[in-house]
Amino acid sequence: MVMGDTPSLDEIRKAQRADGPAGILAIGTANPANYVIQAEYPDYYFRITNSEHMTDLKEKFKRMCDKSTIRKRHMHVTEEFLKENPNMCAYMAPSLDARQDIVVVEVPKLGKEAAVKAIKEWGQPKSKITHLVFCTTSGVDMPGADYQLTKLLGLRPSVKRLMMYQQGCFAGGTVLRLAKDLAENNRGARVLVVCSEITAVTFRGPSDTHLDSLVGQALFSDGAAALIVGSDPDTSVGEKPIFEMVSAAQTILPDSDGAIDGHLREVGLTFHLLKDVPGLISKNIEKSLDEAFKPLGISDWNSLFWIAHPGGPAILDQVEIKLGLKEEKMRATRHVMREYGNMSSACVLFILDEMRKKSAKDGVATTGEGLEWGVLFGFGPGLTVETVVLHSVPL
């Protein structure tokens, strides 16, 4: 072969890249069958943790649960299991092995349930999946949950895997940002994205000196969500985007060190809230919006559809006030919070699913509540904020 026939690096690079933006081609969700009703949870929680003598603390916990706006939460861990593992019911007792035994098995399993639904909606053979991004804050293992899911689904051994452990609640935005870069930089790539979260790693009894831990016990829940992400959808086989991803950014908020911490210890994953998280987020959120939407000439935040990680109702309330958002902007977000609780990284993907389903049911013009442009926010330890600009698709 003569040198002149060899393509230039520029030509090779161009051929490797996709032409269009990354799109979300399918969404699937899954939850454990077991669930708790939030109004009944304080009685159950203080009984199962042998803490009924802590009457003042129980009243505080009741108020937390009442204010949470949550109706029900799915949880893999049942009363029977907790009775057999009393160390998990103490505030600080060595219990990591018992927790790991659950999550190492159940995190990939719940992820599989969501992935099977997403693959079915996508309608293509799973052999077309080129990349897998798996995210969980529940446990760690080698080989990881990404490997286990590859085996459970029967994906090709050559699928390119990325395992994200211990990121926390912002990571639903992170996986979208990564999937976008993978899909747009690898022509024909189809990325399976899975977030699977199980609270077996964080469940613990109450402590009257650590109310921040109780906040987590009032909010956290189990769930998994899966997406197929790809650029240049093949309409001849029925591929069609639900949303397109236009840009994605990540930032650490100023003066927020230690606002949310999680530490994996012998006692499981401990959770600490040390600062005014709703205040820090609401104070800084407009800067992220300006940076994301100035290039598009958009400055009316009510003209966007909204998908925000529902860390807790106070975060949503303060963001609404700070930005002057109409009440209906957070409808999909609040619906997921009410029906599922805070499923960490999986939440924003559940909200995407809720929004496209409700938009279709209501007969509006687009997958984004009839609007063209939208924003997805992930908030979590750091404080880290993920901002994804979304473009809806006509229905």
UniProtKB/Swiss-Prot annotation:
Reactions that this protein is recorded to catalyse: (E)-4-coumaroyl-CoA + 3 malonyl-CoA + 3 H(+) = 2',4,4',6'-tetrahydroxychalcone + 3 CO2 + 4 CoA
Biological or metabolic pathway of the protein: Secondary metabolite biosynthesis; flavonoid biosynthesis
An example Gene Ontology molecular-function term: naringenin-chalcone synthase activity
Group of enzyme by EC: transferase
Keyword Cell inner membrane: no
Catalytic residues (positions): 169
CDD domains, sorted: CHS_like
Keyword Acyltransferase: yes
Listed EC numbers: 2.3.1.74
Ranges annotated as spanning the membrane: none
Record protein name field: Chalcone synthase
Organism, scientific name: Cardamine amara (Large bitter-cress)
Lineage of source species: Eukaryota, Viridiplantae, Streptophyta, Embryophyta, Tracheophyta
